[in-house]
Swiss-Prot record:
SUPFAM superfamilies: Immunoglobulin (SSF48726). InterPro entries: Ig-like_dom (IPR007110), Ig-like_dom_sf (IPR036179), Ig-like_fold (IPR013783), Ig/MHC_CS (IPR003006), Ig_C1-set (IPR003597), MHC/Immunoglobulin (IPR050160). Immunoglobulins are composed of two identical heavy chains and two identical light chains; disulfide-linked. GO terms for biological process: adaptive immune response; B cell receptor signaling pathway; immunoglobulin mediated immune response. PROSITE patterns: IG_LIKE (PS50835), IG_MHC (PS00290). GO terms for molecular function: antigen binding. This is Immunoglobulin lambda constant 7. It comes from the Eukaryota. Ke+ has Gly-46 and Oz- has Arg-83. Constant region of immunoglobulin light chains. Immunoglobulins, also known as antibodies, are membrane-bound or secreted glycoproteins produced by B lymphocytes. In the recognition phase of humoral immunity, the membrane-bound immunoglobulins serve as receptors which, upon binding of a specific antigen, trigger the clonal expansion and differentiation of B lymphocytes into immunoglobulins-secreting plasma cells. Secreted immunoglobulins mediate the effector phase of humoral immunity, which results in the elimination of bound antigens. The gene is IGLC7. It comes from Homo sapiens (Human). It is found in: Secreted; Cell membrane. GO terms for cellular component: extracellular region; extracellular space; IgA immunoglobulin complex; IgD immunoglobulin complex; IgE immunoglobulin complex; IgG immunoglobulin complex; IgM immunoglobulin complex; plasma membrane.
């Protein structure tokens, strides 16, 4: 079996182009983990977000580790009306959480 590998998590805020087009998508990129099972949870200001979430199935990378992405679709109003959004990834019992704050990149 492969050695266990904890995921590296990157959270991308909506781009300014996207906001100008009246859309806002947050992307949580989870990569280089093994075994290939992760749970992704989203939070807005610490409250769970269930609507507009889409998580891909983990796929095997060329290095035999796994990668997955989770997308959170918002309106620009929703994005701006919260202080922070977090993507929380649970893998093999350990949790990684990344947060973005709308105020920093408006």
């Amino acid at each position: 079996g492969q050695p266990k590998a904890a995921p590296s998590v990157t959270l991308f805020p909506p781009s300014s182009e996207e906001l100008q087009a009246n859309k806002a998508t947050l992307v949580c990129l989870v990569s280089d983990f093994n075994p290939g099972a992760v749970t992704v949870a989203w939070k807005a200001d610490g409250s769970p977000v269930k609507v507009g979430v889409e998580t891909t199935k983990p796929s095997k990378q060329s290095n035999n580790k796994y990668a997955a992405s989770s997308y959170l679709s918002l309106t620009p109003e929703q994005w701006k009306s919260h202080r922070s959004y977090s993507c929380r990834v649970t893998h093999e019992g350990s949790t990684v959480e990344k947060t973005v704050a709308p105020a920093e990149c408006s």
